[in-house]
Amino acid sequence: MSTIVQRQKEFNFFDLWDSFCAWITSTENRIYIGWFGVLSIPTLLAATTCFVLAFIAAPSVDMDGIREPIMGSLMDGNNLITAAVVPTSAAIGLHFYPIWEAASMDEWLYNGGPYQLIVLHFLIGIWCLLGRFWELSYRLGMRPWIAVAYSAPVIAATSVLLVYPIGQGSFSDGLPLGIAGTFHFMLAFQGDHNILMHPFHMLGVAGVFGGALLSSLHGSLVASTLIRNTDENESINGGYKLGQQQVTYKYLAGHNSFLGRLLIPTFASRNHRAFHFLLAALPTIGIWFAAMGVCSMAFNLNGLNFNHSILDSRGNVIRSDADILNRANIGLSVMHAPNVHNFPLVLSSGQPIPVS
């Protein structure tokens, strides 16, 4: 009796590496990973996990660095509207503050360490997700405009979570991670920088509102000009098959004939590619400008101010809405001050200016 023993295949690291690379970059996977995904997936998971834990159970944080901790978690008595991950303490400033830099876990939590962990992992994750969009588009032979459009919210998040704290000198000035915290950040930003009077913010508003208008216009016109392949007793959606190559609506009927007669011929559109490009470009460019505005105001290049009232030839104040706006900004600024129980000097000095 003889026994035949086959020789085992030797371990080859390079063959294993080639298989791993093919799996990472394969477009046949249910979820595309890609090389950017190797970094974006774990960082976003880490940020999400830490955010959920901090949102539910993080202890109070000394955000202003004056030993007056702020309670932001659900277990401290907040609800879903008021709860937030409180930014890192002003005592830490812009220092990198990982867990191993603190003397204890309690100290790390008290100084708001989770905020830095969440923000930095989140920013790495969303920038790599942008790269992942480009990578998948490249491998499928598509053009890169999906990644370009996604760059707008990524830049906006980076401006309020990283650039603004850098410009102001502390992560404590960053956006709190919560609903009420977001509105607190907006009001404080208006009081300190008068963002509503910044031209870049105005362009951002025009872009977002214009994009919303075009989206509703396009959607309603498409839904109104669907091609019917069924009789009147069946739903018009019954004649549609997923992935069909035939057109499903009449672009010229809605965007050219209808708009051209409803408004003026100049507003009519005959080129659906140009219209779809405008639909994507308008909000994207608008958010780019808004993010650039936040980045400029991070270094105190603020919006247009009206610190000096309009005077007549005799030196008397001419009442205007600018005075009301200026006083409102001053009120927001002093209410944002950490020691608000002390009467602010900015309101106790100078001549009173009646606004009504």
From Swiss-Prot:
PANTHER family: PHOTOSYSTEM II D2 PROTEIN, PHOTOSYSTEM II PROTEIN D1
Subunit structure as annotated in this protein's UniProt entry: PSII is composed of 1 copy each of membrane proteins PsbA, PsbB, PsbC, PsbD, PsbE, PsbF, PsbH, PsbI, PsbJ, PsbK, PsbL, PsbM, PsbT, PsbX, PsbY, PsbZ, Psb30/Ycf12, peripheral proteins PsbO, CyanoQ (PsbQ), PsbU, PsbV and a large number of cofactors. It forms dimeric complexes.
Species in which this protein is naturally found: Trichormus variabilis (strain ATCC 29413 / PCC 7937) (Anabaena variabilis)
Binding residues annotated for chlorophyll a PD1, in chain numbering: 201
Name of protein: Photosystem II protein D1 4
Residues that, per the record, bind Fe cation: 218, 276
Any one GO CC term of the record: photosystem II
EC number per UniProt: 1.10.3.9
Topology of this chain in the membrane: Multi-pass membrane protein
Residues noted as binding [CaMn4O5] cluster in the record, renumbered to the chain: 173, 192, 336
EC top class named in words: oxidoreductase
GO molecular function: chlorophyll binding; electron transporter, transferring electrons within the cyclic electron transport pathway of photosynthesis activity; iron ion binding; oxidoreductase activity, acting on diphenols and related substances as donors, oxygen as acceptor; oxygen evolving activity
InterPro entries, sorted: D1/D2, Photo_II_D1/D2_sf, Photo_RC_L/M, Photo_RC_L/M_CS, PSII_D1
Localisation per UniProt entry: Cellular thylakoid membrane
Record's keyword annotation contains Cell membrane: no
Reactions performed catalytically: 2 a plastoquinone + 4 hnu + 2 H2O = 2 a plastoquinol + O2
Post-translational modification: Tyr-164 forms a radical intermediate that is referred to as redox-active TyrZ, YZ or Y-Z.
Sites annotated Tyrosine radical intermediate: 164
Record-marked site positions (Stabilizes free radical intermediate): 193
Function noted in UniProt: Photosystem II (PSII) is a light-driven water:plastoquinone oxidoreductase that uses light energy to abstract electrons from H(2)O, generating O(2) and a proton gradient subsequently used for ATP formation. It consists of a core antenna complex that captures photons, and an electron transfer chain that converts photonic excitation into a charge separation. The D1/D2 (PsbA/PsbD) reaction center heterodimer binds P680, the primary electron donor of PSII as well as several subsequent electron acceptors.
